[in-house]
Regions:
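Acidic, Ser/Pro/Thr-rich low-complexity regulatory regions
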Residues: 1-175
Length: 175
């Protein structure tokens, strides 16, 4: 998954959260999903396209008697397809970003012993759902040893709002 695809997921979820705060309305969710799909202008993973299609489906089919998805059904679709809890997505988003970053770093740099050791240590933290700490440790280790990371991999963590991770990432851009 590219950083662009991750951003699409996060932006879509953030938009849905705003709608959910106003109270769930299937028609508004369908319209938002339709408009997001049209205007996103970015690459979207298949899972996100599936969610968008399912949430806007009732809008297209209401004439034929289709019943709109309930709030629970819509939340279940998002959870099942994207593995993100719409009510509390923060942990799921950091998990998605961290796992994707590790996966691509492993594919690109696994022959480097320092990277391999940092990834191994991170996996131990992930077992305990310590995604922020795992990501911080990996970035710190890469920076300490001045290890160059390809820009497309480093950009995966752009979506993380943590100031310490942002500083580490900014420092790694210069390596």
């Amino acid at each position: 998954m590219t950083s662009e695809e991750i951003k699409a997921i996060v932006y879509y979820i953030q938009g849905l959260q705003v709608l959910w705060k106003e109270g769930y309305n299937a028609e508004k969710v369908a319209l938002y999903s339709y408009q997001f799909n049209l205007r996103a202008g970015m690459d979207m993973p298949d899972e996100l396209l599936d969610v968008i299609e399912m949430l806007e489906m009732w809008d297209d089919n209401w004439i034929y008697g289709a019943v709109p998805l309930t709030e629970k059904e819509a939340a279940a679709v998002i959870q099942e397809e994207l593995n993100i809890d719409i009510y509390h997505p923060e942990k799921d988003i950091i998990a998605l970003v961290t796992n994707e970053f590790i996966s691509q770093l492993k594919n690109e740099c696994s022959s480097n012993r320092i990277v391999a050791k940092a990834l191994e240590n991170a996996q131990e933290l992930i077992i305990y759902d310590e995604y922020f700490v795992a990501l911080q440790n990996i970035l710190s280790e890469l920076l300490t040893h001045h290890i160059h990371i390809p820009a497309d991999i480093l950009s995966i963590i752009d979506i993380i709002e943590d100031s310490y991770i942002k500083r580490l990432q900014a420092s790694l851009w210069g390596v």
